[in-house]
């Protein structure tokens, strides 16, 4: 299958990098300190902004203070952070005008993880603390398209979560999902599904005509 687009909007965790170990350990530590169910806390946190997770699980708590506790735990825990398959070769190929990152992490945490991973950082990215509404709301991906100077229908979102795929569609983008964290059935909001970016070939077209992605969709 070949898909043509003018810009790529990458989610971060589960698409470019895996910080799953850090995320789960940090939320488990926080949950246990608050007497919350760790498994349910981790499930709630995936694909949702940390602030929203804290607010949902502790509606009467000091949300800003609790967010800082979780973020500090995640900032310190980077031992097993990994760059995912296919990411390095794709980002080495792409000039930065063609892509940016749209993540549910805060800017502080996103920049920390990307630096540790050695991933080149676009001049501007969209993070949790830059939007009023997190995924699955369309705002994050609308803002990402604005960074690239493109209409949302000219952008392809690359996601690994249900909420992220829904956000991309709600923004008016097509969505390519990877199966890093969710099953094919859970990613029904995506237009196409691949195992990882290692299964995707990208060609840059001449004269600023955009990009062509080639892959075999699992959907």
Please give the residue ranges for each predicted region.
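Active-site neighborhood of HAD-like aspartate-dependent phosphohydrolases
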Residues: 1-43, 60
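Asp-based, Mg2+/Mn2+-dependent phosphohydrolase catalytic module
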Residues: 1-6, 98, 107-219
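Short, acidic loop-to-helix structural element flanking the phosphoryl-transfer center
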Residues: 4, 76-101, 105-111, 115
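Phosphate- and divalent-cation-binding pockets in alpha/beta enzyme and binding domains
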Residues: 26, 53, 86, 109-112, ...
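Helix-loop "lid/cap" segments that line or gate small-molecule binding pockets
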Residues: 30, 49-61, 113, 145
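Short helix-capping segments at alpha-helix termini
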Residues: 32-37, 60-62, 117-121, 149-150
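Metal-dependent phosphoesterase signature
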Residues: 36, 40, 55-89
């Amino acid at each position: 299958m070949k898909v043509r687009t003018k810009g790529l909007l990458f989610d971060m965790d589960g698409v470019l990098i895996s910080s799953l170990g850090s995320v789960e350990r940090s939320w488990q530590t926080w949950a246990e300190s608050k007497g919350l169910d760790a498994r349910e806390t981790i499930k709630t946190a995936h694909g949702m902004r940390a602030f929203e997770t804290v607010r949902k699980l502790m509606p009467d708590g000091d949300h800003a203070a609790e967010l800082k506790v979780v973020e500090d735990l995640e900032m310190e825990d980077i031992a097993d952070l990994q760059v995912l398959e296919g990411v390095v070769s794709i980002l080495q190929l792409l000039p930065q005008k063609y892509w940016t990152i749209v993540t549910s992490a805060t800017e502080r945490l996103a920049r920390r993880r990307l630096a540790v991973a050695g991933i080149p950082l676009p001049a501007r990215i969209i993070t949790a603390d830059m939007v009023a509404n997190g995924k699955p709301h369309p705002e994050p991906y609308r803002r990402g398209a604005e960074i690239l100077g493109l209409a949302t229908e000219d952008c392809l979102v690359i996601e690994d979560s249900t909420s992220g795929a829904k956000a991309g569609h709600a923004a008016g983008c097509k969505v390519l999902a990877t199966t890093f964290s969710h099953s094919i059935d859970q990613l029904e909001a995506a237009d196409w599904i691949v195992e990882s970016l290692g299964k995707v070939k990208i060609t840059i077209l001449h004269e600023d005509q955009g990009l062509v992605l080639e892959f075999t969709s699992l959907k």
